[in-house]
């Protein structure tokens, strides 16, 4: 396929300035073979989508962990003070789980207005790891900001990687941020 593309480009006297792929391991070797001197970059949307998927997975696991802490209640109306307190706790935790599920998109949305920030704060109250996830997502979006140059983005990426390393639980979730192909996704920032 790439050989035919190169032939078609040369037949029309067109020049290939760059190639963008989805980050699959299938592309680099054939691209080097056919287009040796053409820069190859990774599509930023695929990387952000993978990070978003990991963040939503972390939100889901936090929600499941919260649901697991709900007290088990016997059937029927709670009669003792302890049973009533357990019922209130269960109702509160179930409401927080439902709110986390309903508003999970707020953890990965690029821009939040004031109302959405308040909702996110209310939903993630008592779960500092989720608040940290949102702060990290804002840094991820800042890395891919079109207004900065590649070197600035690489500096932001280094800062982001150091921040993620400080939180051991988040390090496993966001291991995509340590991928060596991530730097290749930032080459588009110097394009005019």
Regions inferred by a protein language model and the residue ranges of each:
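RNase H-like nuclease fold core
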Residues: 1-37, 57-61, 76
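Acidic/histidine-rich catalytic cores and adjacent linkers
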Residues: 17, 21-29, 35, 71-192
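Inter-helix linker motif
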Residues: 36-60, 64
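Internal, charge-rich low-complexity segments
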Residues: 54-82
């Amino acid at each position: 396929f790439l050989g035919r593309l190169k032939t078609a480009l040369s037949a029309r006297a067109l020049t290939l300035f760059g190639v963008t792929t989805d980050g699959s391991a299938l592309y680099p070797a054939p691209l080097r073979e056919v287009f040796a001197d053409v820069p190859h970059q990774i599509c930023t949307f695929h990387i952000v989508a993978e990070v978003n998927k990991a963040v939503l997975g972390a939100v889901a696991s936090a929600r499941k962990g919260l649901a697991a802490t709900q007290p088990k209640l016997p059937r029927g109306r709670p009669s003792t003070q302890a049973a009533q307190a357990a019922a209130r706790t269960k109702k509160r935790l179930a409401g927080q789980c439902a709110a986390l599920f309903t508003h999970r998109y707020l953890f990965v949305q690029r821009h939040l207005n004031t109302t959405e920030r308040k909702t996110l704060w209310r939903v993630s109250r008592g779960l500092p790891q989720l608040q940290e996830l949102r702060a990290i997502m804002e840094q991820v979006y800042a890395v891919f900001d079109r207004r900065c140059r590649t070197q600035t983005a690489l500096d932001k990426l280094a800062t982001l990687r150091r921040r993620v390393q400080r939180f051991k639980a988040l390090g496993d979730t966001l291991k995509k941020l340590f991928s060596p192909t991530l730097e290749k996704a930032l080459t588009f920032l110097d394009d005019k």
